[in-house]
Amino acid sequence: MAASRSTRVTRSTVGLNGLDESFCGRTLRNRSIAHPEEISSNSQVRSRSPKKRPEPVPIQKGNNNGRTTDLKQQSTRESWVSPRKRGLSSSEKDNIERQAIENCERRQTEPVSPVLKRIKRCLRSEAPNSSEEDSPIKSDKESVEQRSTVVDNDADFQGTKRACRCLILDDCEKREIKKVNVSEEGPLNSAVVEEITGYLAVNGVDDSDSAVINCDDCQPDGNTKQNSIGSYVLQEKSVAENGDTDTQTSMFLDSRKEDSYIDHKVPCTDSQVQVKLEDHKIVTACLPVEHVNQLTTEPATGPFSETQSSLRDSEEEVDVVGDSSASKEQCKENTNNELDTSLESMPASGEPEPSPVLDCVSAQMMSLSEPQEHRYTLRTSPRRAAPTRGSPTKNSSPYRENGQFEENNLSPNETNATVSDNVSQSPTNPGEISQNEKGICCDSQNNGSEGVSKPPSEARLNIGHLPSAKESASQHITEEEDDDPDVYYFESDHVALKHNKDYQRLLQTIAVLEAQRSQAVQDLESLGRHQREALKNPIGFVEKLQKKADIGLPYPQRVVQLPEIVWDQYTHSLGNFEREFKNRKRHTRRVKLVFDKVGLPARPKSPLDPKKDGESLSYSMLPLSDGPEGSSSRPQMIRGRLCDDTKPETFNQLWTVEEQKKLEQLLIKYPPEEVESRRWQKIADELGNRTAKQVASRVQKYFIKLTKAGIPVPGRTPNLYIYSKKSSTSRRQHPLNKHLFKPSTFMTSHEPPVYMDEDDDRSCFHSHMNTAVEDASDDESIPIMYRNLPEYKELLQFKKLKKQKLQQMQAESGFVQHVGFKCDNCGIEPIQGVRWHCQDCPPEMSLDFCDSCSDCLHETDIHKEDHQLEPIYRSETFLDRDYCVSQGTSYNYLDPNYFPANR
């Protein structure tokens, strides 16, 4: 037992053995450092950790009467934390070994089943190269080894062994790699649970902390160093002293259920939980696939001493000196071979296989080797390894769904190296990891490095993409920028046009229409090309049509509809802002409040704007002519007025000629009544599409028109005095505006008489002259058949020119005097001969010139030199308008037929 063995150097032991990181990266995969066999175990330990100060802590073999001494021992060990590794003396190790052997001999009298013996022989045959097989072992220790290798199982269970490799962290940053050979299934005694509970109690973990421990297969905690040979009596003492006797096995079996209720996305700053999390990461990363998922499904029953001795007997690769006894030297070399065999036997699909419950116990035992006050410095290792693909220990980066770790395809040594890389990437700030974030890593590590123990589909469900706050803020800003509407205007446009919504929408529509026109031209060219190809091969073209193949024909476009613009706000004499205060009481207080509320309008507000106050305007929403959303996207406008659901279908719509004729017939059919509203209701019911209010308004306007035209009114004659006051700025007064309006439908059945224009006597004169010219040209001596010849037209031109010459000669002779007209340039009065009258000046301020001053450049404030002058050859007679009988249709008090409606 005192013989040495070869020790495998792993990534977890590099810093402890004095090796640098570069050596770890180059040679650590498949390299082993063998120590001389003649060196004793004590010297081997001291040579591997020469800086450790030996501080012997005697561990007494306790019984039920020595609880106080052991607890003092535990408290003393908690009060001091060594930043360096230390070694144990040989006396300590002898005492520990002796105590372990005595504990194992107590249960030596129990019979050993033949199945266990056969398993033991198989284990020995698997490791023929072991350096310790040649040394004889006493018969009593052989029985102890047989009992300590396996858990007490029934003979019916299959005996295939699974190797579980656990990485242990103690209070001095020590790392141990244990090898536990157990059967597939095995019951565990409740004494084991009591022992683990006792360790938890000694370390200050009571029932309230049981919810924090979320992993069955790895319960990270501890400050005691008796992780492999602690006595059962000591555990009873610990349980009794800390009041944890009520802790049952269900705390561990139900911890998987507790872990399912933990939010894996919320961080916290519990340093204690952080260290537990890191220990759990390291342990579970070292587990093979088939050992991870079965830990919560096995019953926990079995003899305690066998479990403890199996932990002691199957240790492998002890890297640091702790409270481990001399049983470290009893570790077999075949455990290395079994580790490789178990890793190679991992299923390629990553599906979980049953694993013994003893893994949970070993993880519990090894997690109790770390003091609480040392947890803040435990994760500050200076070693950094390159992050592996899908590393679950890197908490600073968000999890990604596509990060499945391909551990199944790696060799055993590569797997171990990868796990060591993951171990070295622990966060240095203990406040970065929350209790709920511990649940993330616990759950993900239970899955065995992202999907080792669970199927990949289940493992992916626990890992989601969590964007950082900056990413979410940038995404939100980008969405807000995308919501901003596109503004269409030219830099050279006027400021009023740049901020005008109708102008911007119009430019946007023009831009879209131009693009659609370009696309239409390209589509026409494509259609012509396809037509020529189809004419070359018509049969193939028809076959493609029958097969419904994609020929590449262009798709039809949805032509953008022209925007509806309310022109009243631009053509009316008053703007929106002035119209708002027209015909209202102009109180200063009210005007000030309105200004404070709405402010000065930066641009004219269109009634077409469907947005409310405070909402952003959208200029990019263009209605499509053939789309159903074109008309329903905003409120309907009918001749400049908003139409809502409360308005009738014919709201603000012009009356058609048919409706007007039917109205005239109904006015005769329904005579006037005392209550006119009844009459209007009857007519509205007869029409069917108009309301009584619309009929009353129409009839009122119709009666006024009839009265002004002098036509008998089929009802009460309205008082025209109320309606005779017209605005001088009416748009209908301008003669050019008569083409902008549709003819009235009021007088559809009445043909008004034709009157001569009384305001212009010259039109009568010119019309008479034109008639005379036409009479003169119609010479009956010339046959009708010759009147279409060009010679006849030339003859008419000569006759017209002759008449003009005669008029000019008469004017130059001085016989014509324009009485009442004075030349505005030379001042001669009356003007003789031809009088030149300005046509561009207003009639009240028009200028007249004589024939000699017609070529002068006379200008005034009103008259300019570019004005057009009209020659007048004949003098006009004076006509006093005050003595003329009015030919209008308005009332006249001199008219004997004057009979007003209201007397």
UniProtKB/Swiss-Prot annotation:
Molecular functions per Gene Ontology: DNA binding; histone binding; zinc ion binding
InterPro entries, A to Z: Homeodomain-like_sf (IPR009057), Myb_dom (IPR017930), SANT/Myb (IPR001005), Znf_ZZ (IPR000433), Znf_ZZ_sf (IPR043145), ZZZ3 (IPR037830), ZZZ3_ZZ (IPR041981)
Cross-link entry Glycyl lysine isopeptide (Lys-Gly) (interchain with G-Cter in SUMO2), positions: 276, 647, 708
UniProt entry tagged with the keyword Nucleus: yes
Residues annotated for Zn(2+) 2 binding in this entry: 838, 841, 863, 867
Domain of life: Eukaryota
Disulfide bonds: none
Biased composition, class Polar residues, residue ranges: 1-15, 61-79, 297-311, 324-344, 390-450
Region: Disordered, residue numbers: 1-149, 297-358, 373-481, 602-636
Binding site for Zn(2+) 1: 823, 826, 850, 853
Purpose of the protein: Histone H3 reader that is required for the ATAC complex-mediated maintenance of histone acetylation and gene activation. Component of the ATAC complex, a complex with histone acetyltransferase activity on histones H3 and H4.
Protein name (Swiss-Prot/TrEMBL): ZZ-type zinc finger-containing protein 3
Organism: Homo sapiens
